[in-house]
């Protein structure tokens, strides 16, 4: 990552994620009154006084608990601090200093970076000074009374933060970044895949379903191309999800699909294609994203020379409505074929952004109509395609101007889409055909009437 990092740390439920949302101007980190909601490192861009930087939210630090996740969370915090230029220790001004705050402060004093103390939940500026004064005892310098919810005092805190940051370098534009969402059912190996791709334990990996709750962004670069990888909460059937942090994480996962240009749909090779996989694929189609189907845990499958073909057939049968997607069989645990994912993602993004000239589109249409004319209606009306033109990309969208859209039934529309794919490719991306009525004389005036051969 090229931008400087500001790490947010503290014990559970002091308002770290609320502060991240305040500093970055968007509600991305999950906020809930259940302690320990944030487990992984989540990065978000921020800007203050001509400085661009990333704010990293971390899990709540607890030193005196044997819960399985806590050693993993501590490792995530250590990694975040190793990346950071400055850390913000968030404490609760209403509760005052706790033993946990003192323990964390002692640990932070051993780290080789500046630490600022943000005394949160100081809703009154007058009382905030008194609430903040107590935290001088932590030995980390002047406390900053703030209200993450209302924004009080955050400007002064940011002024001090940016004093530790270098001037902003010229950054490549957002249009150069390919957004890639990693989605799938719980425990199919999404976080393991992210870690294998990045080369570090970026997201917490655990055999317990639902470990990842936030959508987590990681910027990586391969062969000169930058990718933003978004690891998401596993998506289960709605009836199995309580209206707590996991519910919000699933909503975040759906929003991650909306943000993405390419989606990696991760399947578990041991489970095959499930009903929930089909629903996820349907969401990807609805959002118009490019897609690469990643079959994980391939190393655990007993194989013969036909296994991969049988599995591909199953994928094509059960996910036939997303049959244009590319497939790759990997093992995130062993790293098998993981590096080839970037090649597939790059090709899918290229096709997703692709534009085709009007002349080429009409050559395809002329051939298609010549091979298979539009069927006539029961009343004898013949469907006619006058011309087509691409009106947008991401995904490629082609408007077809016809005499009456009602004359073109689903099977013929699928035939036309198939001809575009056969002659032009579009592997890895959906294409959308817009059937529009147009009078014959208008088409003839343009001189682009598609005729039967």
From Swiss-Prot:
Locate the KH-like domain: which residues?
354-439
The residues listed in the UniProt record as binding GTP 1, with positions renumbered to this chain, are: 10-17, 57-61, 120-123
This protein's record includes keyword Thylakoid: no
The biological process GO terms on file are: ribosome biogenesis
**UniProt keywords, alphabetically:** GTP-binding, Nucleotide-binding, Repeat, Ribosome biogenesis
Q: Name one Pfam family in it.
A: KH_dom-like
**Molecular function in Gene Ontology:** ATP hydrolysis activity; GTP binding; ribosome binding
Task: Please give the PROSITE patterns that the UniProt record associates with this protein.
Answer: G_ENGA
The EngA-type G domain extends over 4-169, 178-353
- Give the binding site residues for GTP 2: 184-191, 231-235, 296-299
UniProt subunit comment: Associates with the 50S ribosomal subunit.
UniProt similarity note:
Belongs to the TRAFAC class TrmE-Era-EngA-EngB-Septin-like GTPase superfamily. EngA (Der) GTPase family.
Quote the protein name from its UniProt record: GTPase Der
Q: What is the lineage of its organism?
A: Bacteria, Bacillati, Cyanobacteriota, Cyanophyceae, Gomontiellales
